[in-house]
Amino acid sequence: MCPSMTAAEETFHLDTSRKDLTGYLYFIWHTYFADTPRVNEVHIAYSYPWKSRLGLIRLSLDNTLTFIGINTLLQHPHVPDYVLLTTIAHELVHYKHGFGSPLPRRYKHPHANGVVDHELEAHQLGDPIRLCNEWIDQYWYAFYDRFHLWRPINGFAQNKQS
């Protein structure tokens, strides 16, 4: 269904298990967003298998907790690592811009004028964002239709749909 990775794509493979989203988050934060202070507690977990959303970020009412939800399908082995990397980095851009975080809000709208992609480029994530966008454009909807009922069970990926 999906092509094998090229050498350029393999560059973005992380040494962290997809099950350890906290490890992914802190690796990405340390490596690409060291200029962004963590001003509250940040939790990350897999969420619903949305068809048209890869992630979300929310701030608690008392501003003490940020939650980043990641589409559960991104832990599937057919999804390239750069899609997960880019999704988490995308949510960190929102955090940095004051959406889903107590930091001052920098813009009126979170995606105005392509600000997220510009920020990802500025943080040396231009190649992964391009690869991610290409993969999403070419494979996401067919992948979703085939695997949206898929759930990892007891740490092992199983496809409920043949």
Segments and roles (model prediction):
Residues Y46-W50, T72-L74, E91:
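Generic secondary-structure microfeatures
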Residues L61-T66:
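Active-site beta-strand-loop-beta-strand hairpin of nuclease catalytic cores
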Residues T86-G98:
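Active-site recognition of the HExxH zinc-binding catalytic motif
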Residues C2-R58, F99-S162:
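Metalloprotease/metallohydrolase-associated module, dominated by Zn2+-dependent proteases
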Residues I68-T86, S101, K108-H109:
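Short pre-active-site segment immediately N-terminal to the catalytic Zn-binding motif
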